[in-house]
């Protein structure tokens, strides 16, 4: 069976796409395919000439922009292993991730030059620091991205590649520190549909030549990944545009702006958008509802989401403004693709948190018994087929998440479900206390540790409270030291100096006693109920 490699796919796409087709759009700047091909080939060759070797890790530390897409493509072509970096991290989090990943190359935006300057000496194994100019004052003793992309003939590298080449997706770990999920190119391509999309009836391609022939006759997509490309959902949305010979549109705003998104859809005739549930969809619906005149979003045919709840009411709101939309709600994670899906159109409504079980999925109890449809039992959903190799440098976590059951290797990321009589899944949530806020994984232990470093805090517990916008809102309940004064905003500001801003609790609630069990264990259920009741009372609900 032929092995797939993203660098080979891009070389093949480069060879057939009309050179004047637009490949990347960011603000007013458009890069056409002939220039995308030339620049990514130049960049790939320059990184290898600079000392990188196949298998080395290349980390990307920037917001969504065209250079991010170019850098990903160049890394694929040079056989370098992609590493995503959360641009919200503070310095010790960055050092941990880049050191854990064994990053040899870091491509970063100039806005982050001060952070890079602060950590460089602690990362002696990074051989190339490549800076993308973005209007901010850059750093010293760095390599200019643009000089690498523009220097050279732009010819293909002409190197052999392998389906075993890797892509790392760093995701939250059980202690709050990120872990690198290792995907082989061949497995990731097959796991994402092998150039097709079975959820809307597009079959996979059997090999590269058949895939290329299909691209010659299919209309090219215009994709708009709205989540950060530093996460899997946004990243795969951008990669899909490039590997399909289409156009990837990215927005300039530092945070999600629904009006900018709608303007981009209208202006660039976007055909597919990627979101993360209600955190993106609700602002889009609200912007559409208030707009006068209404933006023209008739070109948009598919909106895909993964990672957080996407409610039926919000889906209906989108369909009210464009009845031709297909809304694909994917049940997946960095460790497990294709756990389930839910497709909604104007003719087919679906319930919230209900998914069709993927064809390679089963549901198991904690003692590894298979849960049968309609049994009323709950279990953890598992998927076989194309899977990650495991977690980088973490054999114990790999063995736990990717067990072999009855001779079959599965990925079981920890999502609890109930299998209904009709075979559909009702999503119950993570068995752990992981908080999912707008697609970001936040583990309570890390936030609790930051809170407990505050002089006024004797103890702290952190939970996720249901939130219409964020999916879950991070809420802390703190037990104060005797005679300590409570200042919620000051405490938030303190925590923000120790962990990334998105992990800082939206609310901090004081209590006299957290009532831990004698063995020190926390009653998270009680804390969550207390937080929900308190917040309801404060809102007057």
What positions do the PLM features span?
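Structural core segment of the AMP-binding/adenylate-forming
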Residues: 49-50, 80-150
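AMP-binding/adenylate-forming catalytic core of the ANL superfamily
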Residues: 89, 95-96, 106-108, 332, ...
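AMP-binding/adenylate-forming catalytic domain of the ANL superfamily
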Residues: 132, 497-521
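Conserved pre-ATP/AMP-binding loop-to-beta segment of ANL
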Residues: 152-170, 176-177, 182, 213-222
């Amino acid at each position: 069976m032929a092995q797939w490699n993203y660098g080979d796919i891009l070389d093949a796409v480069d060879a057939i796409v009309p050179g004047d087709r637009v490949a990347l759009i960011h603000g007013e700047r458009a890069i056409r395919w002939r220039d995308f091909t030339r620049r990514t080939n130049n960049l790939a060759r320059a990184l290898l000439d600079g000392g990188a070797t196949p298998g080395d890790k290349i980390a990307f530390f920037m917001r969504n922009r065209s250079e991010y897409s170019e850098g990903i493509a160049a890394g694929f072509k040079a056989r370098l292993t992609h590493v995503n970096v959360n641009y919200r991290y503070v310095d010790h989090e960055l050092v941990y991730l880049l050191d854990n990943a064994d990053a040899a190359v870091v491509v970063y935006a100039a806005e982050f030059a001060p952070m890079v300057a602060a950590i460089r000496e602690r990362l002696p194994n990074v051989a190339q620091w490549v800076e993308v100019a973005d209007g901010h004052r850059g750093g010293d003793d760095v390599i200019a991205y643009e000089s690498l992309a523009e220097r050279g003939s732009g010819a293909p590298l002409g190197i052999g590649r392998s389906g075993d080449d890797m892509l790392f997706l760093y995701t939250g770990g059980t202690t709050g520190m990120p872990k690198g999920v290792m995907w082989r190119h061949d497995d990731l391509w097959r796991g994402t549909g092998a150039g097709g999309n079975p959820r809307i009836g597009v079959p996979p391609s059997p090999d590269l030549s058949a895939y290329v022939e299909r691209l010659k006759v299919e209309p090219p997509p215009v994709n708009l990944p709205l989540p950060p490309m530093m996460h899997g959902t946004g990243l795969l949305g951008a990669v899909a545009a490039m590997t399909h010979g289409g156009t990837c549109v990215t927005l300039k705003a530092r945070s999600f702006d629904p009006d900018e998104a709608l303007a981009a859809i209208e202006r660039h005739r976007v055909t597919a958008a990627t979101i993360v549930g209600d955190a993106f969809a609700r602002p889009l619906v609200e912007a559409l509802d208030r707009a006068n005149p209404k933006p023209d979003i008739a070109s948009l045919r598919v909106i895909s989401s993964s990672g957080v709840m996407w409610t039926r009411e919000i889906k209906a709101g989108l369909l009210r403004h464009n009845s031709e939309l297909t809304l694909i709600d994917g049940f997946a994670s960095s460790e497990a693709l294709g756990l389930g899906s839910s497709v909604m159109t104007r003719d087919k409504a679906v319930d919230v948190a209900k998914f069709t079980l993927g064809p390679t999925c089963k549901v198991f109890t904690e003692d590894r018994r298979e849960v049968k449809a309609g049994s009323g039992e709950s279990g953890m959903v598992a998927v076989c087929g194309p899977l990650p190799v495991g977690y980088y440098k973490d054999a114990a976590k790999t063995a736990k998440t990717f067990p072999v059951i009855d001779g079959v290797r599965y990925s079981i990321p920890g999502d609890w479900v109930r299998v209904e009589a009709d075979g559909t899944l009702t999503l119950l949530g993570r068995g752990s206390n992981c908080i999912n806020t707008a697609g970001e994984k936040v583990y309570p232990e890390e936030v609790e540790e930051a809170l407990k470093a505050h002089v006024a805090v004797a103890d702290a517990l952190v939970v996720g409270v249901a939130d219409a916008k964020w999916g879950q809102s991070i809420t802390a309940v703190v037990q104060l030291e005797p005679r300590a004064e409570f200042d919620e905003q000051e405490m938030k500001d303190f925590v923000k100096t120790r962990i990334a801003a998105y992990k800082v609790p939206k609310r901090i609630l004081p209590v006299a006693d957290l009532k831990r069990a004698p063995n020190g264990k926390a009653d998270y259920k009680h804390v969550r109920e207390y937080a929900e009741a308190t917040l309801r009372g404060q809102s007057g609900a």
